[in-house]
Design a protein with these regions (language model features):
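A residue-level marker of the well-folded mature domains of exported/periplasmic proteins
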Residues: 1-217
Length: 217
């Protein structure tokens, strides 16, 4: 709509691997784009570097803040993070999970321990805790301790085998509802849940019921 009503030219580039991040961002600079939007935390370094080198270009980064390389958030004059309070949705998921579990154990795990992942896990933990307080129950959360910020991570957003293995571990410990926060790795967890037959998966980032019908029920 903005292309026709405002006369804005829009360029797009899709990254097929990490090696594409920098060239894709720089191609936008070369094409004369004055607002460049990176989608996803993986593009943080490429967008950050380009913003430092091109002060007359504006940048935005979806789903991640900018950092100094040591996980300390930094502010850039010509770039802004676009972050969403996903803890709120995860809180509701945690509350419902605590109310639905038949074993008294639910679980969550992440891909990599970064803020855009742990914010989901924090919200889920708060939801479980709120249900326990409201209902006088003692539902246990596996995979994440909000207070210590310690938990389970696959160190990958791609390897579905790792998601399956992590879910199987939780299932063996008694969890019957699992919320993976690990992109496609979560589909491995869904496969484990389907194979078990008594475990439910909570999807993030999209409507998994529609996006992954093989695991809908």
């Amino acid at each position: 709509a903005s292309q026709s009503s405002l006369g804005i030219q829009i360029n797009t580039a899709e990254s097929n691997s990490d090696a594409d991040f920098n060239p894709n961002v720089e191609s936008m600079v070369s094409d004369g784009c004055n607002l460049i939007i990176g989608v996803g935390f993986n593009l943080e370094k490429a967008v950050h570097t380009s913003a430092d080198e091109n002060k007359d270009v504006h940048y935005a980064l979806i789903d991640s803040s900018f950092n100094d390389g040591n996980n300390n958030t930094v502010t850039l004059d010509n770039a802004r993070p676009l972050l969403f309070n996903t803890a709120e949705a995860a809180y509701l998921a945690g509350y419902v999970a605590a109310g639905m579990t038949k074993t008294g154990k639910v679980a969550t795990f992440g891909g990599i321990q970064i803020p855009s992942v742990t914010v989901f896990m924090d919200g889920f933990a708060d939801g479980v805790a709120a249900y326990n307080k409201a209902k006088g129950t003692n539902v246990q959360l596996l995979g994440w301790d909000k207070a210590s910020q310690n938990g389970s991570f696959t160190q990958s957003f791609d390897d579905q085998t790792l998601g399956k293995e992590q879910a199987q571990q939780f299932i063996s410990q008694g969890a019957d509802i699992i919320m993976p926060v690990a992109g496609p790795v979560g589909l491995g967890a869904a496969a484990a849940a389907k194979a078990d037959g008594n475990t439910w998966i909570i999807g993030v980032d999209s409507d998994w019921y529609e996006a992954n019908p093989d695991y809908s029920s």
